[in-house]
Amino acid sequence: MAGIIVGIDGSDHSRRALEWAVKEAAIRHAPLTVLVVQPAIAGYAGNAVGYPGDASLADQARKTAQEETDQVLAQVGGSSPESVTVQSAIGIPAAVLIAASQDADLVVVGSRGSGGFSQLVLGSVSTQVTHHAHCPVVVIPPRRP
């Protein structure tokens, strides 16, 4: 999966990361992988009547990510990445991105910019990926007023 990987979750900060990654992949003439991770629901087997299992949730997340990616590609216009692939996975977002970084040239993530005590105690996906990725990481900061 050489090229650029961008992790998205449907938030505004991940959309900014996606926009940046699309432009960077186009500049580098590199393939872009858009990765959305659906956290597993602890203690939930799924498949009960009316309730989707983890695989269904991941598939829906991939479809939503594909729509968002298509919108960003149309919005950015101009040159585009060598190729764009949208993938979904089930797991812990930081762990999945770190594992994917083994075969990447660059990982791009957004940051909520929360910082402070909550980040110290809980960590954040961007912090964990920055510290443990196997390739360079770009963290797109939140917009400032």
Please place each PLM-identified region on the residue numbering.
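Glycine-rich, Arg-bearing micro-motifs that act as flexible, cationic patches
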Residues: 106-131, 145
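Small/aliphatic-rich secondary-structure junction motif
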Residues: 2-51, 100
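Short glycine/serine/threonine/alanine-rich loop segments
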Residues: 28-31, 82, 135
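Structural beta-alpha unit
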Residues: 13, 74-107, 144-145
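General small-molecule cofactor/ligand-binding pocket signal
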Residues: 35, 85-89, 138
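Short, conserved catalytic or interaction motifs in soluble domains
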Residues: 10, 119, 142
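A short acidic, glycine-rich active-site loop
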Residues: 52-67
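Hydrophobic structural packing positions in well-ordered secondary structure
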Residues: 4, 21, 97, 108, ...
